[in-house]
Amino acid sequence: MAIYTRTGDAGTTALFTGQRVSKTHPRVEAYGTLDELNAALSLCVCAAKNPQHRQLLENIQLQLFWFSAELASESEQPAPEQRYISSEEIAALEAAIDTAMGRVPPLRSFILPGRSEAASRLHFARTLARRAERRLVELSTEISVRHVLMRYINRLSDCLYALARAEDHDAHQNNIIQKVAERYLAAIRTSATREPAMSLSFQELHQLTRAAVMRAEELQVPVVISIVDANGTQTVTWRMPDALLVSSELAPKKAWTAVAMKTATHELTSAVQPGAALYGLESHMQGKVVTFGGGYALWREGLLLGGLGISGGSVEQDMDIAETAIAAINVRTHQ
């Protein structure tokens, strides 16, 4: 079946009522821009990772068909049997906005539009929604346009912005998880190929623990001392009398974090701040990772031997005790 009629070859098009108008008519510009937006939303649906976002975007695409049909008709009100935009659709957009914005950190400056493909496409669609809104405002100076349509298109651009932020946030968090997993797997592979002798001996474990206890006694700070091997498995845990109960949880986590991330825990502090590369790491690791001082990776000849975690005093005291203990044996805190 032919899709061409040749009736538009002269630069005119027909409205639903049969009236022919110029293809540059504000009414045609308005629903034509909605058509552009709908096509862009198809790309958004394909790129979005969140299934709820995809379903919402498909619903919006259907609603834009109703919207365009209303603009292509000269009737001031939609026919009773016609599907049309109502306050219900606006409420759904507002609910989606609130949900998406409730999941992302606040912004204090302008951002580049989109760090992921889905967010980039959503931001592009947002600009088309804004253009459609401008065309609708222009059209409203010539004909009567239902106010609910103005509200809907205004809210739609906000919704696309919120979805873009949420898609970016999810992509960033997934990237963090992937990086942590890669580092952890790399640590496992390294441990599987290292020389059997390249681990802390019983004498070194004893010396490390003893040096930590002696320094803690000098500072009059009861602490918990935890040492893990290169696989993150605990080899030594020593709790001094009167050490805080919470320290029995924190010290092993500090030691494990130092091995998993191959770095001292205090060096992670800046990396997990909002906007930094590892922001959200702690929540995604369900509290297993510690990002304040007291945990150190233990290296020798470029190989990771294990990790030391101290908890019980202030961050500075924990770091002091750990560094004093490390100085007592032949290891480094950096590769």
Curated annotation (Swiss-Prot):
<dbReference type="GO" id="GO:0046872">
    <property type="term" value="F:metal ion binding"/>
</dbReference>
<keyword id="KW-0479">Metal-binding</keyword>
<keyword id="KW-0460">Magnesium</keyword>
<comment type="pathway">
    <text>Cofactor biosynthesis; adenosylcobalamin biosynthesis.</text>
</comment>
<dbReference type="GO" id="GO:0005524">
    <property type="term" value="F:ATP binding"/>
</dbReference>
<dbReference type="Pfam" id="PF03928">
    <property type="entry name" value="HbpS-like"/>
</dbReference>
<dbReference type="GO" id="GO:0031469">
    <property type="term" value="C:bacterial microcompartment"/>
</dbReference>
<comment type="pathway">
    <text>Polyol metabolism; 1,2-propanediol degradation.</text>
</comment>
<comment type="function">
    <text>Expression of a cosmid containing the full 21-gene pdu operon in E.coli allows E.coli to grow on 1,2-propanediol (1,2-PD) with the appearance of bacterial microcompartments (BMC) in its cytoplasm.</text>
</comment>
<comment type="similarity">
    <text>Belongs to the Cob(I)alamin adenosyltransferase family. PduO subfamily.</text>
</comment>
<keyword id="KW-0067">ATP-binding</keyword>
<keyword id="KW-1283">Bacterial microcompartment</keyword>
<keyword id="KW-0547">Nucleotide-binding</keyword>
<dbReference type="GO" id="GO:0009236">
    <property type="term" value="P:cobalamin biosynthetic process"/>
</dbReference>
<dbReference type="InterPro" id="IPR016030">
    <property type="entry name" value="CblAdoTrfase-like"/>
</dbReference>
<dbReference type="InterPro" id="IPR005624">
    <property type="entry name" value="PduO/GlcC-like"/>
</dbReference>
<dbReference type="InterPro" id="IPR038084">
    <property type="entry name" value="PduO/GlcC-like_sf"/>
</dbReference>
<keyword id="KW-0169">Cobalamin biosynthesis</keyword>
<dbReference type="InterPro" id="IPR036451">
    <property type="entry name" value="CblAdoTrfase-like_sf"/>
</dbReference>
<dbReference type="InterPro" id="IPR009221">
    <property type="entry name" value="PduO"/>
</dbReference>
<dbReference type="GO" id="GO:0051144">
    <property type="term" value="P:propanediol catabolic process"/>
</dbReference>
<keyword id="KW-0349">Heme</keyword>
<comment type="function">
    <text>Converts cob(I)alamin to adenosylcobalamin (adenosylcob(III)alamin), the cofactor for propanediol dehydratase. Found in the bacterial microcompartment (BMC) dedicated to 1,2-propanediol (1,2-PD) degradation. PduS and PduO allow regeneration of the adenosylcobalamin cofactor within the BMC.</text>
</comment>
<protein>
    <recommendedName>
        <fullName>Corrinoid adenosyltransferase PduO</fullName>
    </recommendedName>
</protein>
<dbReference type="InterPro" id="IPR029499">
    <property type="entry name" value="PduO-typ"/>
</dbReference>
<dbReference type="Pfam" id="PF01923">
    <property type="entry name" value="Cob_adeno_trans"/>
</dbReference>
<dbReference type="GO" id="GO:0008817">
    <property type="term" value="F:corrinoid adenosyltransferase activity"/>
</dbReference>
<feature type="binding site" description="axial binding residue">
    <location>
        <position position="206"/>
    </location>
    <ligand>
        <name>heme</name>
    </ligand>
</feature>
<keyword id="KW-0808">Transferase</keyword>
<keyword id="KW-0408">Iron</keyword>
<comment type="subunit">
    <text>Forms a complex with PduS.</text>
</comment>
